[in-house]
């Protein structure tokens, strides 16, 4: 191929067009002196932008990290030669980095211009590190010089350098700037910082509140413990940590002989954990929120003050702090990821569009190039073939000559046979039989590996060895057959085959190495376990599973960048930890701290441990003790651990989950069409039983992969490819496809009520309809019409009966909980037994009744055909049997008694909401099946590897110096706490670890506890110390074993468990949506509509009394708010300043301050009560809260005063006497402790002030509302498990130092629930499990037989605790998360989309216009109201008036007769418009659909409200839309008139042509615009708007005038023409009214009005001034705009009958050429509707009379007696004038119909108003117009006239948006905003 081919040339030409990577634009000068031409700068630029330079720097950074890691920190700042060498190497790194920074600064400039060096965040980081490094070196030199002069100071100076040296650890962060995908992850996290900051505030706030409560309640309580009398030795039993005690009350007593309870103990954890002052209190609370070690704190507090109520404090803390607030972090992160991904997507789309054209060009070049290449390739190929063949023929002739024909034939035959064999082989390999055969071998392989265990017999070992070889040969055969059959290229195309090949080769290698003795059998046998991955071969025909596996593999790849970030993070903190704590975890006692920072691998493990959150607190305590204990420098250490924990555990680990949830959710949004397609394909495949993926499917998959968005961001990396994953997981949902595919039901059975397809909640709210009696007879004797059966049916379906049964279920459950588990024959149990009989009989009767009604089980619809009924039957049967079997076979009875616990489950069938949640759970479980399977397989694989590595190695002798069981005999000495004086003699025992890897089951159990993060460090260190089978441990023997655990934790615990959790969450969210699947509203729309329907206006109370008004003014001012805010903050500070052992003076001051604050807050309450009166005050929940707090505080003050007064006799506690032995410190005002809480509660008031936090709270409460059934389910779960626990484990003795002790046991129901709650938070649950397993000591009071005291507990504990933990951790807690994520999506959502949290603003602003909360305001105020509310809800203040009005017409609320609009209708219209709910298509139909939807979802909506927000069809009402339509037509007429004037230069003659032109204006301009507005198509509308404004500028139509809305386009142009000269004159008749002034609702009431007038018909003073000047009260403008007021300039102006008469719209003739009748338009629109016929229409407001500018004769010619006419005569005259224009009406109807406004054409009032406007525009009298219209009509054929008049009635459908019924146009389509 020639290089200079034309294609090549073309390609080269096109090449430059490719987008070049952007180079930083270089500033012309750097450092003020170096220009771009400067050689130094040129050199620097070329070096810095040279690609290898970056690589060199990255390598240097990497080398620096290695150097930092190799450094060995030593105690007491010792050093060795390695460390000294590394110190010297440090200088080299520093020089390299300094040079790099200097060159970059020279190249790019330092700071002052864009793109300078320091303008990039990463460079700032680099620069800081380099600068600190240089600074450290300088300081060190100074130190050296100083140490020569003054040796004493060296020690002190050296410390500063050490602190600065710690900054070196940030250098690895520079790797981030080199790896783009890392920056993406970080960017996503940074983006989430703002909402995370809100959450951090909320957490901080909670911590502060709880810390202060803790301080008030528990300070000084932790300092007493049990000492041996007369010594300072703490008295504890074996294995027990010292804990607080109490001399009185119900705290812990000292039971050990010779011990007493006394003070002087520093407290638990060396005095770090306590509530003595605010700082320690906060630390303790924070530790509890992290759910690590919180039970210890609870138990210590229980020991100190009794266990009656401290649990309330801790449980609420965990629920609010851990489950709720910390899960918000997850909500925020996943929201951010979704947003980032969407951004990347849209960015990608945009770029695609931009590059498309260019790509096309490039493509043409490339394509021609490639095709050319291919052609040449093929030609080459052919030539090669030919030459071969030719060669062949040559040789052939030679051979022929030699007579060697036979060989040739043999070769040919061989090729032929080879081909046949290959085909055969190919068919075999692809056949199903072969596949199942391979699966069988894999199963055998799995079996042989899984059968390995510790101490296995020799024959088994041999068998396994043989099996291993045989199976290996089989696998090799399979591999070779595949290679032969498929050909190498095709074979290696499949990833699975490559993997297979690797496994087989490693197996062969292993056998060779072991045989040759080059390697111990152990090390490589791990490879054998990798063979287990072959299990995944099963997935070949299980498509859903194989896709899940494929997507998981892909997602691992995409999470790689996150793992890299995690690794960097761990490295940095490990290095920092080494700098801070290296060599310091070296304490007086003999115990070795395993989690330390003494070398790099160990530091990595320690940081990783903190990251998983396991036992991080003990590491923090050690760190604090290393720096001198709980005092000044030591406490700073906790900052390191807290930052590490927060960033690592909350943020980075939640990012895992966020990515998982985000991708799952993203995949959920695959269109239902796609899902249906997949489902259909799957069904076809299943029916045909096709084995493999079709080619088409493969190609679609490949395409899908290519289509991944190319934007930046985790969004793409983390795309997890869960698209396929999800769609296929959806395919798995076989058991209940109906629950996942919209409109897809099971194949075999139609909808059955038992399928866990949740019933829509809407149906659940109302009572279900009774199930009819089935046709068949019941018990073969009762026919369907039998009276007894009918009666039973009536009873069973009665509400009272259901409630009665529910009550009995509750009572029987309570009875179960009340049983005494220890003393079986106690009095309590006897009484309960009788009750039990009663309950059982009631339930039996219920079941008999139901069976009589529905039949037993033979026919459809019978009792036993429903799962829930079967459950009922089981429970009742169990109760009956256990009552029968009183004494016999004890164990059977025991099990049956346990089964009674299922009773509460019967409530599920009765409470519909609960049933829905339960069904939801079933669906979730069925959906998760695949993930469980994959996780289990992985778990199994790791378990097998664990067995290979650790079987039989977890034994040890209690005396660590002995290594084997033989040596481990006899006794040995122990020095207690390293004290040579305390010597103990102990017996040597050979013990086995509780969790071990001796066989696969134990290994899986051990790994399961690791995956829950509980107790894994202990297991890890046992594994690291493990030596050989049956030999004791050696310290840090194989540190590399940590890799096994860390990989397991990352893969299973971080990744699989999070995918699992994500799945549960997504499933629950989906299930929540299925309820509303067919209601066509999405979640946000539902919430907004619900808000609009349920909201009520706020009462804005403004007192009338002047003094009260003054108070009200003060109380509602912002200064008052700030003052209270400051006072609450002060109060908080005062509360936080208290501490243990504070001086008397301090006590006195704090008491005085407390009284002072109480008085201030009481004053605030009194002032507010005065201002708002009781009704207004208690209307606000915050005020109620304030009130309670004030009352509580007052009681608190009174109590503490009494207490102080009685202090001499021992306080309140001792009023009844008998307090001689009370410790005054302990009586610490327990009675008033409760009321002291009120002091702290004031803090919560702060929440009502901060906006962001308030929104958080709002949602918080929302999510609580969403939780009731979920909470009920959790309560049920806890109840059932607690009762089972009491029955099973209640008899275990309480032994201090074990897990079942005085604080943690199953002996009473509350204790059992608390213990389960502890397990749910994961606090050492595996140790409780072990403490409950078989062989534990029995409680002395229980009824065990002699010699059986060690028979309590049962191995059922394993199933019990694991099932409970899984249910809790994966389902229940995730329900919390799901609910939270559902409710908190607003935190990260797009704020431009209207959401329910925006709607509060509407209520607040509405209240200003409607302070009495009547729910109505004048429709004129709506425009101002909506312009005050910012988008997305309102229009915002910059919305042009014309657009605002168009939007109003789109919203089109119904008007009441008094001209007001209602609150709910306006809000509903706003929501509907903003969210485009049913705004397209035929409008009446849309309205009806929306009404139906609302009735379906919100069944309890009153019809009155529904008619208010969506008026039913045929409702003849005036709407805002009418006004606008008329207004628009007038405006077009005005423009038309203006055009004519400008065209002719004078007023044209009155003729037919003009009227025709006017009608054309309706058809061609006005009608389409109204259509558009009405159909909500404002996108085109706003374009048009701009065009019109431009045209108007040219025409000079729109003049600016200061109206109500500030600068507004003046549409209200004069309608009568003036001589051209006067066209631009503007008499200065009215003042401008600014927007701000007008905003006050009071302002609108400032204008005097005629008391008789209707507010709606206000004077339309909004005419052009010239009209007023010429005495022309023109009312032809739309009433919507008639609210523009002008201030009167003429104080002498008075109202005369004449002006009023003129305003009434009578045809008052005025002399003069331009005169015209002032028929008021609003009459046509409103009066007829608003008033019953025959009543007088109300008079509109008067027009201000203008004196001076009107000629006398005109004035006098106005008949003065008009106003004396009777109402009747007025209305009749008006009616006659209205009905006198049939011809005009017909013409206008035609025009409207042609314009597509058939519905308006049917509205007589509208036609009349338009006729009037037409007359005005043409400047004719109506009579003149009528004459010309008649002529026009005559000119047309009659049939056409008929047709068009019919058309106006029939063509209503041509405009679906307007109402067909006459005049009802209230339901215009809201425009799109």
Swiss-Prot record:
Listed transmembrane segments = 52-70, 86-106, 116-136, 161-179, 197-218, 310-330, 433-451, 463-483, 495-514, 524-542, 562-581, 634-653, 800-818, 831-850, 867-885, 893-911, 931-950, 1039-1060, 1119-1140, 1149-1170, 1181-1200, 1232-1250, 1269-1289, 1357-1381
Q: How does it sit in the membrane?
A: Multi-pass membrane protein
> Does this entry carry the keyword ATP-binding?
no
Q: How is it modified after translation?
A: The alpha-1S subunit is found in two isoforms in the skeletal muscle: a minor form of 212 kDa containing the complete amino acid sequence, and a major form of 190 kDa derived from the full-length form by post-translational proteolysis close to Phe-1690. Phosphorylated. Phosphorylation by PKA activates the calcium channel. Both the minor and major forms are phosphorylated in vitro by PKA. Phosphorylation at Ser-1575 is involved in beta-adrenergic-mediated regulation of the channel.
Which regions of this chain are Extracellular-facing, per the record's topological domains?
71-85, 137-160, 219-279, 302-309, 452-462, 515-523, 582-601, 624-633, 819-830, 886-892, 951-1000, 1022-1038, 1141-1148, 1201-1231, 1290-1311, 1331-1356
The sequence motif named Selectivity filter of repeat III is recorded at 1012-1015
The protein's GO terms of the molecular function aspect are:
calmodulin binding; high voltage-gated calcium channel activity; metal ion binding; molecular function activator activity; small molecule binding; voltage-gated calcium channel activity
In what ranges is there compositional bias, type Acidic residues? 742-751
Q: Which reaction does it catalyse?
A: Ca(2+)(in) = Ca(2+)(out)
The domain-related comment in the record is: Each of the four internal repeats contains five hydrophobic transmembrane segments (S1, S2, S3, S5, S6) and one positively charged transmembrane segment (S4). S4 segments probably represent the voltage-sensor and are characterized by a series of positively charged amino acids at every third position. The loop between repeats II and III interacts with the ryanodine receptor, and is therefore important for calcium release from the endoplasmic reticulum necessary for muscle contraction.
Q: Which disease is it linked to?
A: Periodic paralysis hypokalemic 1: An autosomal dominant disorder manifested by episodic flaccid generalized muscle weakness associated with falls of serum potassium levels.
Q: What is this protein called?
A: Voltage-dependent L-type calcium channel subunit alpha-1S
């Amino acid at each position: 191929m020639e290089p200079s081919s034309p294609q090549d040339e073309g390609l080269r030409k096109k090449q430059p067009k490719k987008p070049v990577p952007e180079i930083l634009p270089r500033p012309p000068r750097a450092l003020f002196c170096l220009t771009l031409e400067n050689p130094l700068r040129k050199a620097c630029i070329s070096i810095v932008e040279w690609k290898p330079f970056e690589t060199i720097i990255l390598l240097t950074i990497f080398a620096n990290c290695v150097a930092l890691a190799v450094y060995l920190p030593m105690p007491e700042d010792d050093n060795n030669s390695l460390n000294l060498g590394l110190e010297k190497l440090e200088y080299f790194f520093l020089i390299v980095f300094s040079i790099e920074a200097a060159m970059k600064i020279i190249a790019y400039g330092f700071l002052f211009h864009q793109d300078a060096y320091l303008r990039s965040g990463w460079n700032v980081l680099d620069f800081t590190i380099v600068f600190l490094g240089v600074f450290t070196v300088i300081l060190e030199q100074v130190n050296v010089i100083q140490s020569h002069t003054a040796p004493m100071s060296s020690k002190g100076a050296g410390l500063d350098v050490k602190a600065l040296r710690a900054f070196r650890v940030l250098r690895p962060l520079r790797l981030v700037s080199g790896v783009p995908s890392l920056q993406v992850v970080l960017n996503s996290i940074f983006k989430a910082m703002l909402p995370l900051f809100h959450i951090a505030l909320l957490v901080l706030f909670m911590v502060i509140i709880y810390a202060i409560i803790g301080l008030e309640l528990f300070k000084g309580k932790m300092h007493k413990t049990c000492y041996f009398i007369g010594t300072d030795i703490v008295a504890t039993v074996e294995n027990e940590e010292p804990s607080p005690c109490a001399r009185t009350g119900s705290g812990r007593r000292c039971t050990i002989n010779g011990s007493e309870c006394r003070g002087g103990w520093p407290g638990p954890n060396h005095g770090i954990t306590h509530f003595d002052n605010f700082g320690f209190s906060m630390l303790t609370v924070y530790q509890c929120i992290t759910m690590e070690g919180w039970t210890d704190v609870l138990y210590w507090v229980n020991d100190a003050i009794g266990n009656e109520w401290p649990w309330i404090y801790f449980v609420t803390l965990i629920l609010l702090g851990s489950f709720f607030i910390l899960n918000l972090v997850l909500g925020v992160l996943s929201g951010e990821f979704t947003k980032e991904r969407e951004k990347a997507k849209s960015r990608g789309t945009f770029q695609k569009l931009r590059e498309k054209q260019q790509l096309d060009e490039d493509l043409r070049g490339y394509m021609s190039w490639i095709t050319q290449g291919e052609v040449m390739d093929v030609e080459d190929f052919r030539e090669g073939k030919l030459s071969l063949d030719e060669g062949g023929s040559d040789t052939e002739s030679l051979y022929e000559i030699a007579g060697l024909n036979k060989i040739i034939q043999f070769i040919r035959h061989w090729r032929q046979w080879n081909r046949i064999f290959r085909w055969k082989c190919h068919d075999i390999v692809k056949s199903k039989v072969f596949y199942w055969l391979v699966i069988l071998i894999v199963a055998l392989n799995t079996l042989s590996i899984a059968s390995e265990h510790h101490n296995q017999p020799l024959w088994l070992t041999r068998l396994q060895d043989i099996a291993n070889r045989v199976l290996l040969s089989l696998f090799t055969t399979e591999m070779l057959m595949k290679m032969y059959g498929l050909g190498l290229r095709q074979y290696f195309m499949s990833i699975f085959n490559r993997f297979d090949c690797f496994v087989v080769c490693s197996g062969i290698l292993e056998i060779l190495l072991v045989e040759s003795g080059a390697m111990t059998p152990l090390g490589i046998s791990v490879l054998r376990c990798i063979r287990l991955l072959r299990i995944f071969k099963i997935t070949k025909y299980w498509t859903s599973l194989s896709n899940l596996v494929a997507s998981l593999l892909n997602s691992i790849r995409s999470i790689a960048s996150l793992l890299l970030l995690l690794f960097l993070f761990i490295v940095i903190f490990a290095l920092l930890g080494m700098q801070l704590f290296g060599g310091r975890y070296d304490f007086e006692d003999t115990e070795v701290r395993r989690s330390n920072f003494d070398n790099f691998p160990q530091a990595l493990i320690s940081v990783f441990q903190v990251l998983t959150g396991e036992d991080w607190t003990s590491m923090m305590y050690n760190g604090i003790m290393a720096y001198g204990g709980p005092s000044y420098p030591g406490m700073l250490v906790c900052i390191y651990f807290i930052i590490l924990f927060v960033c690592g555990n909350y943020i980075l680990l939640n990012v895992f989950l966020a990515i998982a949830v985000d991708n799952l959710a993203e995949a959920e949004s695959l269109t239902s069409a796609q899902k249906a397609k997949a489902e259909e394909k799957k069904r076809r495949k299943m029916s045909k039983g096709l084995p493999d993926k079709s080619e088409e499917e493969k190609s679609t998959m490949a395409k899908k992969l290519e289509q991944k968005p190319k934007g930046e961001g985790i969004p793409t990396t983390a795309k997890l490819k869960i698209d396929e994953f999800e769609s296929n997981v959806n395919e798995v949902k076989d058991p209940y496809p109906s629950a996942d595919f919209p409109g897809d039901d099971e194949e075999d059975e139609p909808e059955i009520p038992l399928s866990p397809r949740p019933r829509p909640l809407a149906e659940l709210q109302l009572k279900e309809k009774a199930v009819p009696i089935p046709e068949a007879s019941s018990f073969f004797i009762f026919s369907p019409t039998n009276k007894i059966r009918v009666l039973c049916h009536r009873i069973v379906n009665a509400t009272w009966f259901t409630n009665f049964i529910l009550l009995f279920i509750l009572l029987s459950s309570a009875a179960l909980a009340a049983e005494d588990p220890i003393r079986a024959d106690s009095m309590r149990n006897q009484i309960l037994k009788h009750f039990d009989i009663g309950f059982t009989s009631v339930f039996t009767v219920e079941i008999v009744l139901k069976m009589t009604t529905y039949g037993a089980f033979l026919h459809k619809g019978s009792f036993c055909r429903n799962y829930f009924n079967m459950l009922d039957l089981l429970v009742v049967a169990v109760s009956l049997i256990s009552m029968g079997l009183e004494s016999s076979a004890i164990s059977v009875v025991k099990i049956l008694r346990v089964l009674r616990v299922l009773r509460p489950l019967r409530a599920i069938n009765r409470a519909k909401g609960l049933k829905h949640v339960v069904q939801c759970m079933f669906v979730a479980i069925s959906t998760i099946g695949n993930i469980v399977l994959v996780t289990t397989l992985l778990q199994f694989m790791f378990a097998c590897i664990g067995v290979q590595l650790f079987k039989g190695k977890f034994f040890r002798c209690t005396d660590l110096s002995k290594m084997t069981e033989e040596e481990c005999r006899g006794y040995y000495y122990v020095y207690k706490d390293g004290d040579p004086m305390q010597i103990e003699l102990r017996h040597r025992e050979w013990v086995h670890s509780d969790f071990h890897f001796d066989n696969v089951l134990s290994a899986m159990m051990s790994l399961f506890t690791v995956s829950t993060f509980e107790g894994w460090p202990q297991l890890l260190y046992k594994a690291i110390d493990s030596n050989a089978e049956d030999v004791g441990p050696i310290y840090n023997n194989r540190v590399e074993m940590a890799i096994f655990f860390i990989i397991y934790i990352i893969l299973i615990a971080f990744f699989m468990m999070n995918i699992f959790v994500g799945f549960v969450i997504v499933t629950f969210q989906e299930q929540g949506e299925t309820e509303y699947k067919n209601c066509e509203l999405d979640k946000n729309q539902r919430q907004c509509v619900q808000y609009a329907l349920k909201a009520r206006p706020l009462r804005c109370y403004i007192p009338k009394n002047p003094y009260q008004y003054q108070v009200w003014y003060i109380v509602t001012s912002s200064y008052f708010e700030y003052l209270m805010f400051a006072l609450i903050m002060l109060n908080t500070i005062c509360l936080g300043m208290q501490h243990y052992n504070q001086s008397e003076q301090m006590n006195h001051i704090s008491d005085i301050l407390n009284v002072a604050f109480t008085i201030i807050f009481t004053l605030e309450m009194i002032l507010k009560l005065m201002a708002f009166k009781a009704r207004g005050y208690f209307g606000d929940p915050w005020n109620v809260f304030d009130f309670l707090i004030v009352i509580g505080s007052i009681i608190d003050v009174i109590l503490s005063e009494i207490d102080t007064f009685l202090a001499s006799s021992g306080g309140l506690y001792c009023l009844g006497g008998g307090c001689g032995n009370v410790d005054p410190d302990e009586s610490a005002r327990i009675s008033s402790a409760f009321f002291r809480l009120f002091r702290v509660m004031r803090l919560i008031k702060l929440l009502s002030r901060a906006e962001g936090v308030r929104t958080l709270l709002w949602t918080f409460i929302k999510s609580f509302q969403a939780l009731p059934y979920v909470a009920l389910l959790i309560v049920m779960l806890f109840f059932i498990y607690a009762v089972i626990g009491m029955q099973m484990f209640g008899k275990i003795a309480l032994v201090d130092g074990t897990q079942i002790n005085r604080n943690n046991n199953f002996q009473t129901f509350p204790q059992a629930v608390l213990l389960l709650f502890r397990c749910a938070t994961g606090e050492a649950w595996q140790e409780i499990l072990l403490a409950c397993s078989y062989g534990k000591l029995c409680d002395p009071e229980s009824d065990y037989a002699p010699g059986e005291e060690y028979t309590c507990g049962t191995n059922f504990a394993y199933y019990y605790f694991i099932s409970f933990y899984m249910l809790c951790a994966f389902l229940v807690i995730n329900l919390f998360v799901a609910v939270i994520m559902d409710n908190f999506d607003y935190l990260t959502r797009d704020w431009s989309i209207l959401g329910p949290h925006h709607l509060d603003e509407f209520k607040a602003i509405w209240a200003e216009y409607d302070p009495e909360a009547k729910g109505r305001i004048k429709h004129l105020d709506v425009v101002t109201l909506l312009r005050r509310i910012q988008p997305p809800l309102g229009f915002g203040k910059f919305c042009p008036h014309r657009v605002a009005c168009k939007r109003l017409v789109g919203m089109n609320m119904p008007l009441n007769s008094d001209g007001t609009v209602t609150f709910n209708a306006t809000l509903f219209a706003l929501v509907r418009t903003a969210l485009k709910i049913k705004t397209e298509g035929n409008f009446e139909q849309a309205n009806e659909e929306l009404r139906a939807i609302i009735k379906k979802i919100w069944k309890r909506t009153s019809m009155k409200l529904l008619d208010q927000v969506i008026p039913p069809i045929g409702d003849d009402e005036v709407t805002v839309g009418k006004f606008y339509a008329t207004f628009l037509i007038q405006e077009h007429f005005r423009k038309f008139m203006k055009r004519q004037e400008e065209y002719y230069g004078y007023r044209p003659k009155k003729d037919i042509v003009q009227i025709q032109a006017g009608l054309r204006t309706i058809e061609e301009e006005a009608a389409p615009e109204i259509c558009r507005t009405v159909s909500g198509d404002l996108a085109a509308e706003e374009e048009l708007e701009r065009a019109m404004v431009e045209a108007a500028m040219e025409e000079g139509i729109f003049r600016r005038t200061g109206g109500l809305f500030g600068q507004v386009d003046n549409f209200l142009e004069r309608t009568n023409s003036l001589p051209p000269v006067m066209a631009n004159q503007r008499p200065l008749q009215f003042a401008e009214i600014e927007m701000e002034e007008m905003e006050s609702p009071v302002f609108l009431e400032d204008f005097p009005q005629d008391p008789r007038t209707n507010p709606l018909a206000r004077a339309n003073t909004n005419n052009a001034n010239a009209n007023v000047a010429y005495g022309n009260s023109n009312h032809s403008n739309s009433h919507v705009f008639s609210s523009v007021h002008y201030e009167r300039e003429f104080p002498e102006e008075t109202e005369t009958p004449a002006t009023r008469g003129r305003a009434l719209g009578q045809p008052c003739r005025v002399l003069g050429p331009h005169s015209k009748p002032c028929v008021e338009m609003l009459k046509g629109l409103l009066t007829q509707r608003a008033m019953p016929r025959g009543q007088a229409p109300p008079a509109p407001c008067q027009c201000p009379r203008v004196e001076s500018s009107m000629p006398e004769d005109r004035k006098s010619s106005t008949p003065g007696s008009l106003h004396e006419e009777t109402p009747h005569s007025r209305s009749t005259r008006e009616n006659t004038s209205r009905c006198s224009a049939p011809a005009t009406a017909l013409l206008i109807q035609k025009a409207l119909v042609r314009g597509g406004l058939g519905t308006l054409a049917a509205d007589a009032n509208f036609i009349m108003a338009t006729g009037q406007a037409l007359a005005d525009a043409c400047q004719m009298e109506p009579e003149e117009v009528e004459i010309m219209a008649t002529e026009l009509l005559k000119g047309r054929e009659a049939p056409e006239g008929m047709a068009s008049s019919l058309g106006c009635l029939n063509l209503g459908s041509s405009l679906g948006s307007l109402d067909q019924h006459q005049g009802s146009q209230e339901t215009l389509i809201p425009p799109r905003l």
